């Protein structure tokens, strides 16, 4: 069974950077050793957003973006290697999620698309890459997401305490870790995505630092109620979503009925949408003793305060309190999934995704043995 140092690479729906994590992994432990966040250039971020909003592009443009992202991921990995004074031969493999640009797991031809050419990562790092984790699950009738609940269970499951792990990235997803029960999990709806999109359009800021702007506004209750009537929130699990659904166009359609709304009030309402839509799902599943939050949303004091207020009797805290960096959780999960793949172990949970069976996930892009020698 493969064990040793692995690198996880994650570029999520928030587009706030490429998270790269170094970890020692074997069948008994996942020990994070180092991490960094690598910036995404503005032109690449724009290209990704255009695709996710359904903007037309040529196959040449898609191919270029695929290559450019692969090179960017390689740069991020090489920066971490240099920081830690490591050589390619010191790393067993890279687990790379890629950048999701479309996710449509239902219909006659369900599909998901992550770009960032893994061949370029191998060529520019000299390290074996495991990628393309989601499509096997979709081929088996699953949603292809979320994949992190299996990792949450491995690291944070408890024999007696009823726990939930909440990842607030661009999209928020919930893992239900209940003793004696199969792990469940699904996307609850927008996390940071709509808040980030609104402040970017209004203030040219990538995100609302410390929720300072939202705190200046007041929740527009009719707007909140209108958004919460979206059918996604009432849909049964398993379910997953992404930027192709909850995007700026979705927000504009809801705002059309509220001309002249104060921009700060809209930001406050979007923060409340994130908190309320999550809290509703926590309560729908019977609540828990501890809600452990990871992802960028764990650093949003307004969302965290609202979750605590909406969920009395539940301890709401970040995973940092349990010794696992909330910022690095997803990248760490894909390092772990790479280890699972190389060990021939399944990476999905049918109880989460709805797949017909558990399966080894991903494709392996082997490094040139000469490069790794």
UniProtKB/Swiss-Prot annotation:
**Documented EC number(s):** 2.7.1.170
Question: Which residues are recorded as binding ATP?
Answer: 12-19
| An individual GO BP term | peptidoglycan turnover
Gene3D superfamilies assigned? 3.30.420.40
**What is the catalytic activity of this protein?**
1,6-anhydro-N-acetyl-beta-muramate + ATP + H2O = N-acetyl-D-muramate 6-phosphate + ADP + H(+)
MF terms (GO), sorted A to Z? ATP binding; kinase activity; phosphotransferase activity, alcohol group as acceptor
CDD domains referenced in this protein's UniProt entry, alphabetically:
ASKHA_NBD_ANMK
List UniProt keywords, sorted A-Z. ATP-binding, Carbohydrate metabolism, Kinase, Nucleotide-binding, Transferase
Pathway given for this chain reads: Amino-sugar metabolism; 1,6-anhydro-N-acetylmuramate degradation; Cell wall biogenesis; peptidoglycan recycling
One family from Pfam that matches here is AnmK
Q: Does the keyword Nucleotide-binding apply?
A: yes
Keyword match ATP-binding: yes
HAMAP family registered for this protein in UniProt: AnhMurNAc_kinase
The Swiss-Prot or TrEMBL record describes its family as follows: Belongs to the anhydro-N-acetylmuramic acid kinase family.
Give the protein's function.
Answer: Catalyzes the specific phosphorylation of 1,6-anhydro-N-acetylmuramic acid (anhMurNAc) with the simultaneous cleavage of the 1,6-anhydro ring, generating MurNAc-6-P. Is required for the utilization of anhMurNAc either imported from the medium or derived from its own cell wall murein, and thus plays a role in cell wall recycling.
Q: Can you name this protein?
A: Anhydro-N-acetylmuramic acid kinase
Give the originating organism.
Salmonella typhimurium (strain LT2 / SGSC1412 / ATCC 700720)
